[in-house]
Amino acid sequence: MAERTFGWVQEAYKISSLKRVIKLFLLNSDVNRELRFDKIPRLVSQEYGRDAFIKELSEERIHIPYQHLKGKGTPKGYTRSNAPCSGIVQAALPGQRKEYQSDWPADSFLRWGVSVGLLDYDRQSDECSLSELGEQYAHTEDGSDEEEDILKRAFLSYPPVCRIMLLLENSEPLTKFEIGEQLGFIGEAGFTSIPQHLILQGLSEISDAKERNKLLSDTEGTSDKYARTICSWLKQLGWVTQVNKTVSTILNEEEYSDTIAQSYQITLKGLRMIKHIKGISKFAKIPKRVMWDMLATKAIDRDYLRNRRTHFLNALQSDFRSLAYLQKYLEVRGISESESTIADDLSSFDNIGLSIAVKQNQYKVTDTIVGLRIPAQIQNIAKSDFSIIKDNIRRKLQYVNHKYLLLIDLGFDSDSNRDYEIQTAELLTTELAFKGARLGDTRKPDVCVYYGENGLIIDNKAYSKGYSLPMSQADEMVRYIEENKARQSSINPNQWWKIFEDTVCNFNYAFVSGEFTGGFKDRLNNICERTRVSGGAINTINLLLLAEELKSGRMSYPKCFSYFDTNDEVHIPTYRDDDYEIHRSMAAEKSVEYGSQHGVN
C-alpha cells in the first residue's frame, strides 16, 4: 500500500487552481482538452510519461495513478527551478517562474481535493478519480450559485475548517499562532505551534520591515501552517477576513506588543456557516469526511494511532460512552490503553474539528462521519515501545499539560532542533516558574533559565540515534560558561548572559536530548575540570518527570538545581528501571524509523 497523507494540507491556496485539478478528470472539459492537446505534448517528454498521460486523460471514466498525477521529484543534475515536468497535475498548475509546478505543490492540491471529498482515492490501485460531488463541481460555472453551494458542502465536510470557524465564532480575531496552538492532536509530532510571545520578542529586536515580514512568514509550526492555509481558503469563500491584530505579552517581566497581519476574523457569511456546522434550526448539518490518514501524521506509531482512533470514533457514533466502556471496547479489539490516553484522544478529536458531546462523564460524536475505514492491509498493528513509554509517562503527568509529551517525539527528530528548543523553553518558563527564554541563535546557548539565585545554561540536542556529546560541543559549552563568567562584550558582542538577572550567582549547565549514548559522562567531567562549573545530562522523559515533581510541589526549585550539580545523567526517582530499559529500546526503534523516513540504512 502506498504511503499517502490525506487530511492535512499545506501550501495549496487558490480554489481556482483546485478547480483546474478537479476539471482535468472530466473528459473534454476545457482543462482536460488543454492538457491533452497542448500542455502534455509540449511540457512532458516521452521519458516522463507523455503518451501514457494523454491516454489516461482520454478515457470516458478517468482513473489516474497517483504517481502519474503528482509526478516525480527533482532528478539528479537538475534544480527545482529547472526540473522537467513529470506529472499531469504539475502541467495543470502554472508556476511562478515556469509554465508548470513541481511535485510538492501538485501533491498538496491532490491531497486537498481528496480531503474535501471532490476526488475519490482507491487505496488498492493507488488511483484518483472524480467523486460524485467533484463531478458536479467540474460542471459548474465559475462564480455561480451552484458552485458556491458545492464548495460549501465540500469545505464544511472537512473537520479542520469547522474547527477554525468555531474558534473564530465569537467574532474576536485570532492570529495564525493562536489558531495553530488549538489545532491538531495533543502532544504529538506533526502538530507544532510557535508560541506567540516568542514572535513578539523576536519582532521587538528587528526594525527592518522586510526582516520583520520574513520572521512572521518563515517562523511557523506545522499547525500554524495548516491554520494559515485553511484561512486562505476561508477568505476566498468570504467566510473570514484577514485583519491586523495588535497583541501583547509579558515575558520575564518585560512587556512586548506588536501587530500581526496574519490574523483572521469571521464574517456575517461565516456566522451563517456556523449554523450548518452546528445543525441549528433549518440549517442541515453536513456529514464530516474523516480520512484514516488524518488521525496521525508524523508519529512513529502513526498506523497504530490511526487504527486506535478509528475504533474510538466508531464506538462514539452510536451512543454516549464512558472512558471505562471505551477502554473495554478497545481491549476486545486487542488494544490496551489507559483512560488518560483515551481522554487525550477525546480532547484531540475536538481539536481537529469533530463535535464531541459530554453528558454525565460520557462522550458521543454528534457528527455523521463518512469515509473512515481502516485499510485492509493494516488491520492489526502492534503498539511500539515508543508509544508504550510515552503513554506510561502520560499517566504520570497529573499536573503538567500533556501537550509537552511532544518533546518525546522531538528529542529523536534530527530535523526538529528548533521546535525542541522552543518547547523545552516553554515547558520551563510557561508551565513552570522559571524565568528565562530560548536564545537559540549564533554564539548563544539554546535556552537559559533561572530561579532565585540559580541559573541553568541549556544545550538541546535532537538526535535520532541518541546523543554522545562530542568534544566539539563540550568545547562550545565551555565557551558559554567562560563568557558568562567574564561578561565582556569584547568577548561576545551579543551579551547573551543579560538574560540572567544580576541576583543570579550560582550557575550550572545541562544537555537535554532524547537519549544519551557513548562517553558523554567523560565529557561532562571534562567540562567541570576546565570551568569549575558542574552540570548534567537529562533525557526528555526525565525532564518531563522533573517538571511534574516541580509543578506538583513535591520538589523545590533549589532541589531541582542540585540534580545538575553532579556531572552525571539525571534520573528522577519516579522513573523506574523497567522504564529505562523500554526507553533504550525506544531509542533504537526511533533510529530505525528515522532512517526509513530519510533513506538512511
Regions found by a protein language model. Give the residues of each.
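Donor-sugar nucleotide-binding helix/loop cap in glycosyltransferases
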Residues: 1-402
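Catalytic core segments in nucleotide and nucleic-acid processing enzymes
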Residues: 385-585
